[in-house]
Amino acid sequence: NTDRPVVNAWRYRNWVFDAMNRDMPFDAMVRHQIAGDQETPEGIVATGYLAIARRFGHDIDKDMYLTYEEMIDNLGKSFLGLTIGCARCHDHKYDPVSAEDYYALYGILASSKYSFPGCEPKGQPKDMVPLLVPSQIETLRKPWQEKADLAKQAKESQQASLGQARKYLSELDPADRVAILQADVPEGAKVPFDSQEASKTIFVRPGEWIQLTVSPKGNHGADSTMVQLVIQAIGSNPNKENPNSDLAANDNTVDKKSVFWSSDALVNDFATTSFQKLGPTNQADLGGQDLVSQDLGGQDLKASWYYAESTKSPELLVELRTSNGGNANIRSWSIGELPSVFANVSDSPANVWTSLAAKSLFMHPGPERPVSLVWVSPIEGQVRVHGFVQDAHPAALDGVSFSVEHWKAPKAGEVFEQMAAILQTPILDPGPAPVIPEAYATVEGTIADARVHLRGDPEKLGEIVPRRWIEILGGDPLKDPKASGRIELADWIAGHPLMARVMVNRVWQWHFGQGLVRTPNDFGSRGDQPSHPELLDQLAAQFVKSGYSIKQLHRWIMNTDAYRRSSSATAEQMLADPENRLLSHYPRRRLTAEEIRDSILACSGNLDRSYGQEHPFPAPATWTFSQHDPFNAVYATNRRSAMMMVQRQRRHPFLALFDGADPNASTPVRQTSSVPTQALYYLNDPFFHEQAAAIAKTLDANEPGPAKVQSMYQQILQRPASDAQAQALLDLVERYEGAPVDAWAAAIRMLMASNEFHFID
């Protein structure tokens, strides 16, 4: 009930068209579609006929008995003109088909395995059938597999090294972890912090680090949080100037000639190509470096910054995103979706999930995963730590807290650097695995005879019925009980005289609008009697004798006197044959929905006669379709209508409008309706207007109007226009308000919307 795409169904569709175009003997076509996997390697694709059967319910595995019923019903109606499915609950009321016959066939089909289309409770498609033999698959996969194995070993080695580094960090002496300050951030608030105001004296050595951690608060989730972290080597501040525009100048500002490292400078790092490289980042504001370098003994002032998840065993944020919230100016490092550190690198605020201030750095913890900004000291000396933490998404109603800590283990900074180096060590990318061509198909499954379902209820089981053929048609047992029996079923159906009669009748129906038997799915006692039984038998016998050639059958029918008659009937004919069952004249019929659409495209010159392959479905890994949100799509194409994507639950709009087949059941006879919405289609539909415009553009602008009219009639209606018809069309073009090409397009639309275009007579 989620109506999921069947990605590989195109292979079966193309197989059918190719078989028809090659005039494959029809009995072979039938055998291939039932048991092709046991006949030839190419025959696997043909078994898509069975695999594509309708699935039922929420958990389709629980309702497979309904799928088997659909298969049995379709096999019986399509090839034999028998309503075998009526015997599911009890013996057929009208035809000599028993419930035991039904469950004998049921066992054959239930002993096979079918590709799984996926369903809401059981996930994505599976059990596709490879179209290569194992040796071919091994040859194709071997070079890639060798690379993949090397990549796996390298990844395992990387993870082992990272595990040792995380273990070291998790086992650091708690005494080396000194809290500088911590606070909550109220909704919508900005909380400044300063180690001097907290009367904290911080003396750092190279390799020690200062860590700002933002954590989810209480039972709340997480929030986007703007942060600033400034590490200042302590110096004088005689002129009270502020090196950071975000902090108001006051007694706590530092001398602009002193050295400080600000997280604000990291925003520039996000904006550059170095953003593509995982830390350490060396960006820092080094105002007055020469002076301070001398004061600090000429120490290297390049500090490293890291972004980490701050659980007991810290983990660096390693996933790079160059766009967030649909905005390329929002760039981030993360683990999964969260936690993350991100920046708005634009000079303007970014309106995404909230308004993010320009040129600012943000942290976003996960619901249970704090996130940290780590500064590793390059110097030995006293520092002051200050900055702010601000709720950047007030409307979210989530809360955060933050803490600033000094970690005194000098080697820990080296461990961060080692972790970054490990993560940046290239691992051979084996690339995508070779694509093994697969079919949505049928293969042998678990072999077993079926029990009768009493009154059709799979919970109430009766006697076991051995797999065999229908009793009235011979009742032959299986030659090999260890196999499913599909190969025998294929032979039984393809070799039975009913199969030839049913197919001949269908081809006749395609040409005349109705078959010699007007119930093409039912040749049983409740079906219609043939209007010309001798003709049906003669054509069936010739069909078999020709080697089941469909093309030869078309030639015989189209060369008959009946096919070449006019659809006009005399009064005597109407009196003698009012329903035209004896074919006293050709039965006028409307084109099918597919024929109408294909004719429109053929007239415009836009008909794409190629088969095509799969439709542009979303990747299966992204499917989240449910019974409340099933898959639904309409893919535009100029290919023949038989190549369009068809869904079970929703018909293509054009096919639905013009009485296309029901995708859920065999449709032996198309209904023909004439409704206002069909006229509205020709007035308003963009596709129809585009095709008419394409024809108009092919008309020679220098050709006189009457010649244009004759060209149009020949192209669209395959005949010349009468003088009156030509004049009427010229009058329409003359009266039309608009460009000449638009006027001719309007005239073309009128011809293609006419009854003459839609009917064969």
Question: Language model features by range: what are they?
Answer:
Residues N1-H32, Q38-T40, D95-P96, K142-S170, ...:
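Primarily short, surface-exposed interaction patches in extracytoplasmic proteins
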Residues Y12, V45-A46, D101, T225-V227, ...:
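Residues that flank catalytic or metal-binding motifs in active/ligand-binding sites
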Residues R13, F17, Q38-Q145, S403, ...:
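Sequence context surrounding c-type heme c attachment/ligation sites in exported
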Residues Y103-S111, I557-R565, M750-L751:
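Acidic helix/loop microenvironments that form the catalytic cleft of cell-wall polysaccharide enzymes
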Residues A148-D149, Q153-A421, T425:
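Gly-Asp-aromatic-enriched flexible segments
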Residues M645-R648, A656-S666:
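A structural supersecondary motif
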Residues A747:
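Globin-like tetrapyrrole-binding proteins
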